[in-house]
A protein has these predicted regions:
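N-terminal amphipathic alpha-helix/helix-capping segment at the start of soluble metabolic enzymes
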Residues: 2-41, 156, 160-162, 299-348, ...
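Active-site mouth loops of central-metabolism enzymes
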Residues: 34-52, 97-104, 179-191, 247-257, ...
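Glycine-rich, proline-tolerant flexible connector loops at the mouths of alpha/beta enzymes
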Residues: 44, 63-88, 122-143, 209-218, ...
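Catalytic alpha/beta core domains of metabolic enzymes, predominantly
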Residues: 136-152, 157, 179-323, 328, ...
Length: 579
């Protein structure tokens, strides 16, 4: 575990600036350095289907996608990229293309011939499951490292010769057995998986590398990228740019909120150089959401500075801030209570009921609430904490919510105070505001900060309450409805995932305490839905495998029977409730 006081992931956690990185050229596009944050997406087709792949690539470029990724699961698919690229360029489209490779090093070498960038997965480029976790030893771990250098060095040399870029793309769901043996199923395992491959690039003096550490859990993704930034400093490696995303985010508002909670938090930390919002929708729908998220989380050069004591804080492993409970409107907030969701008292009067809100906030000037409106208020408290009685509910409503609440928590810790913190956000009905609030709250609860949430500003107050609950669920802080983990679809997907996602939501959406993964294939599916209670995974054309946790329990089910078989499985486990 790293010591934050000696090896931080950013220079100042109270003043966000974009991380300085190497600049990577991908065709005509630039990633990192002083280049704008690049938006990318992925086609749902295989290169062998040339017409559809070209059409989707052109459609993505038309809506402003800065880089298009195409999966190439086989050597034949990688070879098919030649014709795809010819037609894309013949259409006058200059958007750079990246090939996405799993399990097939030969396909990766072939793809280098035709596209500007190739993504490889350290979890399966060399370590393809020859040894199971039970068979791993310290000796096999070291031998595996030698095999990585032996296999990956020629690939790096070829990329360097051709002027291509490489993405070392780690997925939480597909860590190798070697890494899990040494580090466990942890963010450390994700980071060291990337570091191992990056060491080969460094040895070859090749710096046209982008790094990614993705997970379907925003908390895991945030922690992993932070830790990677710190480890690069510790290893004295170059500061390579980061491609940031939350895998399997889902569809609709839930997918957007989960993406904002994870990607937005990293944008606010200055750690993102290119992003993809992974939605179980048409790929074209991802691009405007990503563009809006970048705008919403834009770092401001004139953002205020927070002058507070800086205390040791581990930003790489989740731990909720310890607080004492405070009672507000008859409801306990803080301590061992879940993060509460409230609404303003005047909104309660307007609607005549609290709806699903757990408490009514009488006002930011009503005891025990203590409102700080700007950085000077926090600095004043830090200088004289005894002026505010213990057992208060603190709230920061000034600019830069994330930095302000971090500073407030640091000031409370310096004074040895454990008063709870209310996260209060003002919002309009715009998507930009919604994404920003999700990023703010997602970042803070990932840091273990916040004991209650009030979102204010919607015309219909109950929408504010619903949004607060949805953000807490997106950030894996509190569950209030069925949690769906679904992949965005690509050329590896074995069924119509958008259609199936809709059917599963309709059939299982009433199960509040259940988490269900809907995955198109076996590459990342079983791992990325590791947090799910049950899983629906493509096992072959027209065939589905059902999972309970990480275990496949029903295989080779005809697709037309799979949803009802999932109902039966949940019933067998005593988790089913009638709607």
């Amino acid at each position: 575990m790293l010591d934050f006081t000696t090896l931080p992931y950013v220079d100042d956690r109270f003043k966000a600036v974009r991380r300085e990185t190497v600049q990577v050229r991908v065709g005509d596009a630039l990633i990192g350095g002083n280049a704008p944050i690049l938006v990318q997406s992925m086609t749902t087709t295989k290169p062998k289907d040339v017409e559809k792949t070209v059409a989707e690539t052109l459609a993505l470029a038309k809506v402003g996608c800065g880089l298009v990724r195409i999966t190439a699961p086989t050597f034949a698919d990688a070879a098919g990229l030649e014709e795809v690229m010819k037609r894309v360029r013949a259409a006058g489209c200059k958007v750079p293309v990246s090939a996405d490779i799993h399990f097939q090093p030969k396909a990766a070498f072939e793809a280098l011939k035709w596209v500007e960038k190739v993504r490889i997965n350290p979890g399966n480029f060399v370590d393809t499951g020859i040894l199971t976790l039970d068979q791993q030893t310290d000796k096999s771990f070291d031998e595996g490292k030698e095999k990585v250098a032996e296999a990956f060095t020629p690939f790096v040399q070829e990329a360097k010769r051709l002027g291509r870029a490489i993405r070392i793309g780690v997925n939480h769901g597909s860590l190798s057995a070697r890494m899990i043996y040494r580090y466990g199923d942890t963010v450390e395992g994700m980071v060291e998986s990337a570091i191992e491959y990056l060491a080969v690039c460094e040895a070859e003096h090749f710096d046209q590398v982008v790094l990614s550490l993705k997970s379907s859990n925003p908390r895991v993704a945030i922690s992993a990228y932070r830790l990677l930034a710190a480890r690069l400093k510790q290893e004295h490696f170059k500061p390579y740019p980061f491609h940031v995303g939350v895998t399997e985010a889902g569809a609709g508002s839930d997918g957007r909120l989960k993406s904002a909670a994870g990607i937005g938090a990293l944008l606010l930390d200055g750690l993102a150089d290119t992003i993809r919002v992974s939605l179980t929708e048409d790929p074209v729908a991802e691009v405007p959401v990503a563009q809006e998220l970048i705008k919403a989380c834009e770092l401001k050069a004139d953002a205020p500075k927070f002058a507070v004591p800086v205390l040791e804080k581990d930003p790489y492993h989740y731990e909720r801030r310890e607080t004492i409970p405070v009672t507000l409107a008859g409801v306990k907030i803080g301590g061992s209570e879940p993060v509460r969701v409230g609404m303003k008292a005047d909104a309660v009067s307007l609607t005549g009921e609290r709806r699903n809100a757990e408490f009514a906030l009488p006002g930011l000037d009503a005891k025990p609430v203590v409102e700080f409106k700007d950085p000077m208020d926090i600095a004043g408290f830090a200088a004289n904490p005894n002026a505010v009685p213990e057992g208060s509910l603190f709230c920061y409503t000034g600019p830069e919510m994330v930095m302000g609440v971090r500073a407030l928590a640091s000031a409370l810790a310096a004074a040895d105070r454990k008063d709870p913190i209310l996260l209060y956000a003002k919002i309009t009905d715009s998507e930009k505001d919604t994404l920003r609030v999700s990023a703010d709250i997602g970042s803070l609860v990932t840091d273990g900060l916040g004991d209650a949430v009030v979102i204010d500003g919607y015309k219909n107050p109950k929408d504010s309450v619903i949004l607060a609950f949805d953000i807490l669920q997106a950030a894996y802080c509190r569950r209030s409805k069925t949690n769906f983990i679904s992949c965005p679809s690509c050329g590896r997907t074995l069924y119509d995932i958008q259609q199936v996602m809709g059917k599963i939501k309709a059939r299982f959406g009433h199960l509040q305490d259940i988490s269900i993964g809907i995955m198109g294939c076996i590459v990342n599916g079983p791992g990325e839905m590791a947090d799910a209670d049950f899983g629906y995974v493509g096992g072959g054309p027209g065939r589905i495998t059902l999972f309970e946790g990480k275990t496949a329990v029903k295989k080779n089910i005809p697709e037309e029977d799979a949803i009802e078989e999932l109902v039966n499985l949940i019933k067998e486990r005593g988790r089913w409730q009638e709607p």
